[in-house]
Amino acid sequence: MTRSPLRIPPDRDLSIDFVRAICLPVVVVLHAIQMGIEGDPPRAFNALAEWTPLAWITWIGMIMPTFFIAGGFAGITTWRRLEKRGETAGEYIRVRALRLARPVFLAMLGVLLTLAVMALCGADAEFLRTFAFRLAEPLWFIAVYAICTSFVPLMAALHRRAAGATYFTLAALVVIVDLVPRFGGPPIGALNWLFVWLFVQQLGFGVRDQWYSRRPRWLLLLLAVSAYGLMCVAVFGLGYDPDMIANLNPPTVLLLLLGLAQVYLFTLLQPAIRALMRLRPALLVIGALGMYGMVIYLWHTVAMAIVVGAQQALGLPFPPVLTPTWWITRIPWVLAIIAVLALLCAIVPRIERIWPRERPRTMPLPAAITATVLLVAGVGWVLTQGYLTPGTAAALGTIALAIAWLTVGGPGPNRASEPLEEVTESRNSSDARRL
């Protein structure tokens, strides 16, 4: 039987799908290994906090800038397509926020349900509190990504009119925010949650416009080495923490430089990645990871909770962290999480289909922004306070309100058009199934 050819939209770059997909296993494995459980009664904590080699591994293994570069590529591609159809910025923000809000709401309910089962089975209350706080930490990406996505129409306009000035302004703001506390000013580092990731997202705009691929390969390599060199200056000369994970909260200029290094290295590797993506096995693997990307990212914490609960129920010990026994047991530990996650990938999409169909109506920009703020506020509360706090119910209610508002849309005219980026992704996934 002749295999049907893969239909790929003309504005889709499979090298972007590749890097987004391969980043997911890195995130899952890192979070799984970071989960330390120790003591009597047990407590959950960051197992790698005292493991010094991790700091230098993160110079290569910290892939969050690549996520935002890929997100910037996808965001400006979607927004430009929407503009050509005559859609509004409010509708773009509505669709993108809804595509984040629905999955994260269900995943948060999944975490709470698992924790409730563990509590009913007699798990220690303080262990559950520390464990629940650790499970909430990956939510930072959802909150920040929702904010950055809502800025895409504005940042795309600035990119079109004054791209260079936009890059330099964002970079200058990042440096200023870093320097103010160092000179006795107020602690304003939280502002870099916006400035750093907007800058890195903007790098994805440059990838979309083929800025970097037009440069000589020797120049790209030189720029990547220079970015890493400036990181060394910041660490050894200015006292920055060499651990890129430590530089996440709040983000610092080191992540900006790492984003630059990664965009140059990605551009160098793009021809090889595109050649790899012409192979059917690679398309199958990347298509599967892309198809279940949101499930993998959001539900790997549920998978960890299920594995921990099963380990406690079976009376299996938790070895002291960083010991030889602990490192050896990380292999079955990670494999168990992957197995549960694979099962969740088969179940969760079916559950997600219970959502009512959204009304295709144009949403005014102020309403779309307000709904996005509600989403970020709800996720942000659980992120900073943990799942097991009195405010969790209110936070989930806030997210549910945002979902209802985004689903209904606004008082504008009916639209016959389909959702934007997700249409492309779902078609690509369907094509992957036919390979």
Task: Provide a role label for each language-model segment.
Residues 2-421, 432-435:
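Alpha-helical transmembrane segments and their immediate juxtamembrane cytosolic regions
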